[in-house]
Design a protein with these regions (language model features):
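Solvent-exposed edge beta-strands and adjacent loop segments
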Residues: 1-68, 115-131
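Basic, gly/Ser/Thr/Pro-rich low-complexity segments located predominantly at protein N termini
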Residues: 25, 30-31, 78-79, 90, ...
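Beta-strand secondary-structure signal
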Residues: 55-59, 98-100, 133-137
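Short, flexible beta-strand-to-coil junctions
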Residues: 61-63, 102-106, 141
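Charged, amphipathic alpha-helical segments
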Residues: 63-88
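Acidic-leaning, charged glycine-interspersed low-complexity segments
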Residues: 82-122
């Protein structure tokens, strides 16, 4: 898998992702080793205690008002399609839902239930752009299904012709 073709929150494509900013994050799987007095050189049993997780981090660099509102909450100023500003939220905001990441290599990662944590960051200079620094906290879906999966992209026009034929359910 390689290359980000599109990132969506629900049905909304959230804009350009800064080159080199995507990191899967998360944690490695955890286990407990069981040792025996009679076996000094290795554990006699390893018990898995937690699966590996992902917690992607990335930076959005296409800062139109709709993208800002999509990941930070708050209020858009103006009329639909002709927004003239954005106001920060006045109350605690939790934005959760389905995320999809289409890869250039021909796969799509679907996260049915993730909470976005984001802030305005970066630098305000003529050589860099401001950005929305984002982290997805992947949560268990309410229906008990997998927290994320990776499959061949349904709309192959978004991916390159080098897509892999097999899908991976995680």
């Amino acid at each position: 898998m390689y290359g980000i073709a599109a990132v969506k929150f629900g049905e909304k494509t959230i804009g350009y992702i800064e080159k080199g900013s995507w990191d899967w994050g998360g944690t490695k799987p955890e286990s407990t080793d069981i040792d025996a007095e009679q076996v000094p050189d290795a554990p006699v049993l390893t018990i898995p205690t937690k699966n590996a997780t992902i917690s992607p981090t990335f930076n959005i660099i296409q800062l139109n008002y709709e993208n800002i509102q999509a990941v930070l909450g708050g209020t858009l100023v103006g009329t639909t399609g002709k927004y003239t500003g954005w106001k920060a939220p006045t109350n605690l905001v939790q934005l959760s839902g389905k995320w999809t990441i289409d890869f250039v290599s021909g796969q799509t990662c679907t996260i049915p239930n993730a909470t976005i944590l984001a802030n305005l960051g970066g630098k305000l200079t003529l050589t860099e752009v401001s950005k929305l620094e984002c982290q997805l906290k992947v949560n268990k879906p309410s229906d008990g299904s997998a927290p994320y999966d990776i499959n061949d992209t349904v709309n192959p026009s978004r991916a390159s012709s080098t897509g892999q034929a097999n899908s991976v359910k995680v």
